[in-house]
């Protein structure tokens, strides 16, 4: 199976973040024989929607499975190949943060604004900073109408709407593979010992502080042989 890991970073500040996190992504790809693709020029605004180009990458380069990681992520050096966790009938796998965070009302509001089925209620809300998808889920990467790109958690809420709209065969990723601060608190995880992937979601307000946090966590993981 032809596989790739895709990440993206835009602007000098985020390129500095990627400089810190990319070596671990490269090591992960080398261990698991996966191609690494880094999108570093924005294709649309908000820039986070650039990840929708994964559909084109799949179609033009023949990938059967793609793992996406935000650039503000540290991958432990003993991290399993995430794609092997994909259930047989599942075509899109991500962590369902809507199971414990109040995300679904915003998704419902977006659906109503775009004229989705009246009375519809969302059944999940995935964090799209880490996901695995196959070439059977490309429809979920559909773009919004030109000039109407919603900015509700960037592209995340729109992608969740598309996953519902296309009746994509989804499955939930273990929180250890998307260990955000809220995940640590809710599930009682230790980022250094339990996490396979540490995700610094929601910490971009102070990039310099984020960079120092990533440096410190990277050093701690190395100290633990991870």
Please report, for each region that a protein language model flagged, where it lies by residue:
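Short, flexible, basic/aromatic active-site loop/helix in glycosyltransferases
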Residues: 108-122
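Short amphipathic alpha-helical segments and helix-helix/interface helices
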Residues: 22-26, 55, 80-83, 156-163, ...
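Short, surface-exposed amphipathic charged segments that create phosphate/polyanion-binding patches used
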Residues: 52-53, 106-111, 186-193
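N-terminal anchoring/stem segment of glycosyltransferases
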Residues: 1-64, 166-167, 201-226
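Catalytic core and acceptor-binding pocket of nucleotide-sugar-dependent glycosyltransferases
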Residues: 123-210, 217
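GT-A fold catalytic core of metal-dependent nucleotide-sugar glycosyltransferases
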Residues: 43-106, 132-135
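Short catalytic/ligand-binding loop motif for oxyanion handling, primarily in non-cytosolic enzymes
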Residues: 13-14, 46, 76-77, 83-84, ...
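A residue-level signal for conserved active-site and pocket-lining positions in enzyme catalytic cores
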Residues: 5, 29, 55, 72, ...
